[in-house]
């Protein structure tokens, strides 16, 4: 069919918690197998050999938004808004599954930009299904600076609002070039950095 595939390799090492690695991997695979959306990759198959997992999946051509912002700094507002709209579409899709899927680690490093302008959300290793009646997550996961307060544990179960918080932090980073994952780990009104930015976008963030 002349279609390119990507192979994601996950190795079990003595330093890894083997059970946790396998659990996260199986979670990622089971979630992605059930999903079909233009901003998500498709899982094709998985193999286990010699303490190594090989995941065959769609090859996503392009670069991560992290690589782009690391090289070029803040991105044009028009581009960021376009990416944000696409991210809202895929998050809405995830959050309206039964049960809802919470991504939990939205950040520029987990977003690929294809040459045609379409973004693809990658790496579902921290994603989880929302469990009605559960007080908090079994394992607290997320990236400092982008993570919502409840992701640090003890403040309730992550839900759709968690991903929206992550999205706001991601948009902030993209449009200002200021990384919330670095000291002082704060998010300020975007027009303090660039007065030409939209007041509407500032309010949304």
Predicted stretch roles:
Residues 14-34:
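AlphaC helix of the eukaryotic protein kinase fold
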Residues 46:
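Activation-segment/catalytic-loop signature of the eukaryotic protein kinase fold
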Residues 50-64:
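Conserved short submotifs of the Hanks-type protein kinase catalytic core
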Residues 65-75:
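AlphaC helix of the protein kinase catalytic domain
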Residues 83-84:
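Activation segment signature within eukaryotic-like protein kinase domains
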Residues 89-101:
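Protein kinase catalytic-loop region centered on the HRD/HxD motif
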Residues 145-205:
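C-terminal lobe helix-coil module of Hanks-type protein kinase domains
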């Amino acid at each position: 069919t002349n279609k390119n595939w990507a192979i994601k390799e996950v190795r079990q090492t003595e330093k890894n918690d083997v059970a946790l690695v396998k659990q996260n991997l199986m979670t990622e695979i089971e979630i992605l197998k059930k999903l079909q959306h233009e901003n998500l990759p498709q899982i094709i198959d998985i193999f286990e050999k010699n303490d190594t997992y090989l995941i065959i999946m769609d090859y996503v051509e392009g670069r991560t938004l992290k690589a782009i912002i690391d090289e070029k700094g803040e991105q044009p507002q028009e581009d960021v808004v376009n990416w944000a709209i696409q991210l809202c579409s895929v998050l809405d899709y995830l959050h309206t599954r039964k049960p809802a899927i919470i991504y939990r680690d939205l950040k520029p490093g987990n977003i690929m930009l294809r040459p045609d302008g379409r973004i693809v959300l990658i790496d579902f290793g921290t994603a989880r299904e929302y469990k009605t009646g559960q007080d908090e997550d079994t394992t607290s996961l997320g990236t400092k600076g982008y993570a919502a307060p409840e992701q640090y544990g003890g403040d309730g179960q992550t839900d759709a609002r968690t991903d929206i918080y992550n999205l706001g932090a991601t948009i902030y980073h993209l449009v200002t070039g200021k990384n919330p994952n670095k000291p002082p780990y704060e998010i300020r009104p975007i027009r303090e950095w660039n007065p030409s930015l939209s007041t509407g976008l500032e309010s949304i963030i």
